[in-house]
Amino acid sequence: KGLETTIAATGLTLVGIFNMMGTLISGRVSGIIKKKYVLSFIYFTRSIVIFLLLTLPTNNFIIISFSCLIGLLWLSTVPPTSGIVANRFGTRYLSTLFGIVMVSHQCGAFVGSYVGGLVIDIYGSLDLAWIMAIIISLFSAIIHFPIVEKEKSEEIFA
């Protein structure tokens, strides 16, 4: 949409910086609030941020704001997700199990990138891909609610 390259580069930089902050914050909050609720909040908020990107006029302020917000939400799912895996299955095989989670995530990232490219080729716009991202984020927010988290035990902290 005619974005200046310096704004795009700045936005990408801000995503990385805010990724670190979001991950630290979600890790801390996940120790206080049930991890499934933290994940649901992150995914729901992500859907709102993407919706706002689609509906607000595209300008430098919106792009910079979006970059900061999506950065906060992007990798912030990692601490609560690894916490849920540890809670459900213990820490003995946490590295292997979380490795499987991450490989699955990367496969999803490949599919998402590929589909995004197809959407541009077919429709000449990424709007449909953003709409799909909103739907997937809302779905993700919903499916985390039924997760049963065990009460904290010594094994989880090992």
Predicted segments with their positions:
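A membrane-interface helix-boundary motif in multi-pass transporters
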Residues: 118-136
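Loop-to-transmembrane helix entry/capping segments in MFS-fold secondary transporters
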Residues: 5-6, 91-101
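Structural signature of the two symmetry-related core transmembrane helices
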Residues: 37-52
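Hydrophobic core of transmembrane alpha-helices in multi-pass small-molecule transporters
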Residues: 62-76
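Helix-to-loop junctions at the C-terminal end of transmembrane segments
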Residues: 23-34, 120-121
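Intracellular juxtamembrane helix-capping segments at the cytosolic ends
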Residues: 76-89
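Multi-pass alpha-helical transporter architecture, strongest
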Residues: 131-158
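Short hydrophobic/small-residue motifs within alpha-helical transmembrane segments
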Residues: 16-17, 106-107
